[in-house]
């Protein structure tokens, strides 16, 4: 279960209810199970919005929040009934009797009876909040219940006349992390950092990329994070220039770099770190020259990110650092200001500098036009500058095929930011020292 307290989940539900109209109900559905092949399923992963309000990790569940008026509201959970045979085969179920105490909801009803029960809860209300289009099974249930109400006027049934998507409201709530959430994210960052450190220590020429992937996942598991928060990227050599490379199947060669973008999922929350280091433990001059530009971009971002700034504003400073550095190396040619105006950096830095982080690795929340939203305390985001010199790029030969990204996770505080992932080294000399020490053991 979640390390978020029951009281926090109750506060979140109350915060949503306070933004709902009187005479309304919000329906939040659990994620369905997903088939991997034939009769095998992927490990179950709960819908992040449902988890945000419940911390409940079973499928076939619906949270119903009902606001009768400004002073009366209640919560109902539909979930699976206890079934001893099913539980022998597939694991324990919470059931209805234990759910109110465990989850802090007012009452629990059997999911198998939702078509018979939900229409009674919605009868006479004016508004239903529902994330239409998210899950087909959820739409089928909601549409069936509403149609039953519409056709039941002779039985004194009335359907809500308005349907509103709750996602804009909920996703704005999720953008601002509570102290409890930040504590879990901090732990996710610590575990992820330990895994990246392990990868640096274990790396040797002749290993395959999937060997480091295994080392990383092993470290996640050792600390109670069973799954990565996204598909792990271990790209050596030219593979580091592929942003979402996940094949992880090539032999790592002496003299190449390896870019690892990996994060654990801990109690539902994501870590997300990237480190790039030499397979043999020693940067070449060309690798170091590109690395220093990326590192300066990251360190400048960490100094600048604070309340009142924006991703757009900080990105502008990073682009100037990158363009200036690439001009000095002869990779770009011309006036720095003119090159920036021409977006000349885009072939080498083609992704965003930052994204929100939380229950989803690319977390929800509005960024604003061109990521111009002003940052506020409680927002959690990544900082991930990178430079990728394609193998066939028209640049000095020594730089071709070099891909470097360095990424940390930060939370915006009242006075600046806290780096949640600072415990894994990123300065070149520190990386080399760590890898050299590991080789002596």
What do the predicted segments below correspond to?
Residues 1-441:
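Active-site neighborhoods and metal-handling regions in enzymes and metal-associated proteins
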């Amino acid at each position: 279960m979640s390390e978020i307290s029951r009281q926090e989940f109750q506060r979140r539900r109350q915060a949503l209810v306070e933004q709902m109209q009187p005479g309304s109900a919000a329906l939040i559905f659990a994620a369905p199970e997903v088939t991997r092949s034939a009769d095998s399923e992927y490990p179950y992963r709960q819908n992040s919005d449902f988890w945000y309000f419940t911390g409940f990790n079973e499928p076939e569940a619906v949270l119903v929040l009902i606001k009768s008026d400004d002073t009366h509201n209640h919560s109902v959970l539909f979930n699976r009934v206890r079934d001893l045979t099913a539980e022998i085969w597939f694991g324990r179920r919470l059931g209805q009797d234990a759910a109110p105490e465990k989850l802090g909801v007012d009452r629990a009803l059997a999911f198998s009876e939702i078509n018979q029960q939900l229409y009674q809860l919605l009868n006479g209300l004016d508004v239903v909040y529902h994330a239409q289009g998210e899950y087909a099974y959820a739409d089928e249930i909601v549409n069936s219940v509403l149609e039953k109400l519409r056709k039941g006027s002779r039985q004194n049934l009335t359907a809500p006349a308005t349907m509103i998507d709750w996602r804009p409201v909920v996703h704005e709530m999720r953008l601002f992390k509570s102290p409890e959430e930040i504590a879990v994210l901090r732990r996710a960052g610590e575990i992820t950092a330990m895994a990246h450190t392990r990868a640096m220590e274990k790396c040797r020429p002749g290993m395959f990329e999937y060997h480091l992937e295994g080392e990383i996942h092993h470290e996640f598991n050792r600390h109670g994070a069973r799954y990565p928060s996204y598909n792990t990227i271990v790209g050596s050599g030219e593979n580091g220039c592929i942003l979402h490379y996940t094949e992880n199947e090539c032999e790592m060669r002496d003299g190449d770099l390896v870019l690892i973008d990996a994060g654990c999922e801990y109690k539902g929350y994501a870590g997300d770190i990237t480190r790039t280091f030499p397979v043999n433990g020693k940067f070449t001059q060309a690798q170091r020259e590109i690395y220093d530009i990326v590192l300066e971009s990251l360190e400048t971002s960490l100094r600048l990110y604070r309340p009142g700034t924006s991703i757009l504003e900080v990105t502008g400073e990073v682009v100037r650092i990158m363009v200036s550095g690439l001009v000095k190396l002869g990779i770009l040619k011309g006036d720095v200001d003119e090159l920036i105006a021409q977006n000349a950096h885009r072939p080498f830095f083609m992704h965003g500098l930052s994204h929100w982080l939380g229950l989803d690795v690319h977390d929800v929340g509005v960024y604003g036009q061109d990521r111009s939203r002003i940052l506020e305390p409680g927002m959690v985001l990544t900082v991930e500058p990178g430079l990728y010199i394609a193998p066939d790029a028209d640049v000095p030969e020594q730089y071709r095929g070099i891909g470097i990204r360095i990424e940390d996770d930060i939370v915006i505080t009242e006075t600046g930011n806290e780096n949640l992932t600072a415990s894994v080294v990123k300065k070149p000399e520190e990386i080399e020292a760590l890898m050299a020490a590991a080789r002596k053991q």
